[in-house]
């Protein structure tokens, strides 16, 4: 049986917001409104301390939601906010990221007085079949370079499926 391992697809979309204290709570509310799911808390490492920024070990510094279902629908809503245009420098191997300055630009979302004006980051991660070789615990292997997704392949995929323009 021959399998086409060159076929790529979107693995997940990650929405994240940074902040501390009251700002973080507003970010939690915003992500819950956008996705309908409970956000996870991002913490600093147990040994990390940055006094200049007021960061202490195990401090909550952000919120994140990972979306694996209804990806095309959500991604189209997010791309509308940036006019379906991405820069090539926003691309990386196997993923790309972009920022949304104000959540009220997302279609279907209205201004929330208790949240105020906030932005968020969107990361889109791609994958190919055969990735489980690297992720499994027993008999783990390495993924060859041909399985990694290049910037050019991501650009082609986004232009075909989402009519995205690249600068």
Stretches with model-predicted labels:
Residues 1-167:
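Ribosome-associated RNA-binding proteins
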């Amino acid at each position: 049986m021959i399998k086409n391992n060159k076929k790529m697809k979107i693995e997940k979309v990650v929405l994240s917001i940074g902040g501390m204290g009251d700002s973080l709570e507003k970010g939690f509310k915003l992500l819950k409104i956008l996705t309908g799911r409970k956000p996870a808390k991002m913490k600093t490492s147990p040994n990390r301390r940055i006094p200049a920024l007021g960061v202490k070990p195990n401090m909550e510094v952000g919120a994140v939601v990972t979306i694996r279902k209804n990806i095309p629908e959500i991604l189209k809503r997010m791309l509308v906010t940036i006019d379906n245009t991405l820069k090539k420098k926003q691309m990386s191997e196997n993923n790309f990221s972009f920022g949304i300055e104000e959540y009220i630009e997302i279609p279907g979302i209205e201004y929330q007085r208790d949240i105020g004006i906030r932005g968020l980051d969107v990361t889109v991660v791609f994958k190919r079949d055969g990735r489980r070789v690297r992720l499994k615990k027993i008999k783990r292997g390495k993924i060859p370079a041909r399985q990694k997704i290049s910037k050019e392949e991501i650009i082609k995929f986004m232009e075909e499926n989402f009519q995205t323009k690249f600068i």
